[in-house]
Amino acid sequence: MAKKFTQHRGIVLPLDAANVDTDAIIPKQFLQMVTRTGFGRNLFYDWRYLDAEGQLANPDFVLNKPEFSGASIMLTRENFGCGSSREHAPWALTDYGIQAIIGSGFADIFANNAFNNQLLLVTLSEQQVDELFQQVAAQPGIGFTVDLESQQVQAGDNIYPFAIDPFRRHCLLNGLDAIGLTLQHDADISAWERQQPSFLR
């Protein structure tokens, strides 16, 4: 069973960029692995490091700034996750420790891949996202609370309601991935199989 997401509070990582594509999230040279772990170190590799070997950190990139160490909520702009479909993108984000991303829009294929990997995407208006960026700029290292049960983001004294597909909300709240959903009907599946002719079993 996947991990349940009900409510999460964490340090906010402000990635103030629009149209961040999946090749920026996890470059193609790291796509050979097929397990979900080990991708976090290579998240935003080309922006995060100044050398090809990944030994020299870029001090100006947000992931390398000490005030955002341990961040688990990302704040970004519109059309995050555009470009080619690669499930490695949410793998890299979750392996790094990101549990929720707040933005003003997400690419459809990325959104599907994120959901399949229990990564919550919260869509707010551009004005609301601007307000959140202003809060983080005024107080680097600030924490927000993302509450999936009440469908709202708490940022300081401000509350931002958000909408989410009811089915996806149900799955995230209950820790249900594709396998978990199937196992909910295990008894029905077994009963159907027993009814089939022996030559079909």
Curated annotation (Swiss-Prot):
InterPro entries: 3-IsopropMal_deHydase_ssu, Aconitase/3IPM_dehydase_swvl, AconitaseA/IPMdHydase_ssu_swvl, IPMI_Swivel, LeuD. One of its GO terms (biological process) is L-leucine biosynthetic process. GO terms for cellular component: 3-isopropylmalate dehydratase complex. Its EC number is 4.2.1.33. Keywords: Amino-acid biosynthesis, Branched-chain amino acid biosynthesis, Leucine biosynthesis, Lyase. It catalyses: (2R,3S)-3-isopropylmalate = (2S)-2-isopropylmalate. It is an enzyme of class 4 (lyase). Pathway: Amino-acid biosynthesis; L-leucine biosynthesis; L-leucine from 3-methyl-2-oxobutanoate: step 2/4. CDD domains: IPMI_Swivel. GO terms for molecular function: 3-isopropylmalate dehydratase activity. Catalyzes the isomerization between 2-isopropylmalate and 3-isopropylmalate, via the formation of 2-isopropylmaleate. Belongs to the LeuD family. LeuD type 1 subfamily. This is 3-isopropylmalate dehydratase small subunit. The gene is leuD.
